């Protein structure tokens, strides 16, 4: 699986900073039914990939159901302005836009973010990595205000997107550099992103790719004839 994941055109392919897991525990979602009741079009527009990704993430972030059978999402998105729907819609749009500009698969970017932080902008690892893609403030994060500036981060924290565009852009830059450093191999690039070593065998790369496949399944299940393009 080499640079075959690196993309062309409007759809999609695909970094050492976070040596830890800031991910909350998710149960495996049974289906994409929960997202069907939510119309994300008003929030993300008609862009088919952003829409498909938002629906997949919506289902992925459900942790349980209420007694009335209503889906309950992870805590971090329930406390922002507009609630989980606003955060999911905003981050899905940001992920799609920044990924397309970087020629990286948005579903891979989302998988990295889920694996790194559970898509929680305020997640902090034991080594101080922050943001949805967990940038280390001593390395790539030292140029990103959200990572190193506490007052700026506080101002961003309640916004649906939590100023994550700059974080995602920096993370994707690091990821692409890592893939190049590791000979164009996506799995080795992911290993470097997590550990700083191309040949590190700690299960991180396979877990990211597994998360990507899960998101694709959920997106396809919720697509209902949408024109999103999926790369398997």
Show where each model-derived region lies:
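Catalytic glycan-binding domains that act on GlcNAc-containing polysaccharides
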Residues: 24-26, 37-232
